[in-house]
């Protein structure tokens, strides 16, 4: 049975990544916390697939909205940084990613995917998990999708904004509406 994570401290991580500059570097939850940033951490199964580029590029296309909300976006798969870079360097018209505005991290030892409960052990790939972590490192939101279904960026932004209100948000709440 899966352990509850929401409301608890999120598992800490540091991973190699391809940064928005296309340089290799590292990303960590600690760095986001030190910078007083929210973290939108999402896992996807693998590079060079069909659904993944649609959601990865959609998140990048809306990155400025996340940035306006003091949130850093980090995409994660179990692929290597070299595979990530090759995919980023592939044009979107050819099922590539093109330039991204946030890092893609490489969880090659599967440790982070396992700690967040999204690793499909027998396949060595992650489910589509989405985790929103506040600047204090507390996991505020988690959802896991079947790998055939891409995420909704509008919903991710709505949930992030709802969490940032600090209030009670009723069903179908939209940014700008009153909380309870």
UniProtKB/Swiss-Prot annotation:
InterPro entries: AhpC/TSA (IPR000866), Peroxiredoxin (IPR050217), Peroxiredoxin_AhpC-typ (IPR024706), Peroxiredoxin_C (IPR019479), Thioredoxin-like_sf (IPR036249), Thioredoxin_domain (IPR013766). Pfam families: 1-cysPrx_C, AhpC-TSA. PROSITE patterns: THIOREDOXIN_2 (PS51352). Coiled coil: none annotated. One of its GO terms (biological process) is response to oxidative stress. GO terms for molecular function: thioredoxin peroxidase activity. The keyword Disulfide bond applies. It is found in: Cytoplasm. Gene3D superfamilies: Glutaredoxin. The keyword Transit peptide does not apply. It catalyses: a hydroperoxide + [protein]-dithiol = [protein]-disulfide + an alcohol + H2O. Its EC number is 1.11.1.-. Belongs to the peroxiredoxin family. AhpC/Prx1 subfamily. PANTHER family: ALKYL HYDROPEROXIDE REDUCTASE C, THIOREDOXIN PEROXIDASE. Thiol-specific peroxidase that catalyzes the reduction of hydrogen peroxide and organic hydroperoxides to water and alcohols, respectively. Plays a role in cell protection against oxidative stress by detoxifying peroxides. Homodimer; disulfide-linked, upon oxidation. This is Putative peroxiredoxin YkuU. It comes from Bacillus subtilis (strain 168). The lineage of its organism: Bacteria, Bacillati, Bacillota, Bacilli, Bacillales. The gene is ykuU.
């Amino acid at each position: 049975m899966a352990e509850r994570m929401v409301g608890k401290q999120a598992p800490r991580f540091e991973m190699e990544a391809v940064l928005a500059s296309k340089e290799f570097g590292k990303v960590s939850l600690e760095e986001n916390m030190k910078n007083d940033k929210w973290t939108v951490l999402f896992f996807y199964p693998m590079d060079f697939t069909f659904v993944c580029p649609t959601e990865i590029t959609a998140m990048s296309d809306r990155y400025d909205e996340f940035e306006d909300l003091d949130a850093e976006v980090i995409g994660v798969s179990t692929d290597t940084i070299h595979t990530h870079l090759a995919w980023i360097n592939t044009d979107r018209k050819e099922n590539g990613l093109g330039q991204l505005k946030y890092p893609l991290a490489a969880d090659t030892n599967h440790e982070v995917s396992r700690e967040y409960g999204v690793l499909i052990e027998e396949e060595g790939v992650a489910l589509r998990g989405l985790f929103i972590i506040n600047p204090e490192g507390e996991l505020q939101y988690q959802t896991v999708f079947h790998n055939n279904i891409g995420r909704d960026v509008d919903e991710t932004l709505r949930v992030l904004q709802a969490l940032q209100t600090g209030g009670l948000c009723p069903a179908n709440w939209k940014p700008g509406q009153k909380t309870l």
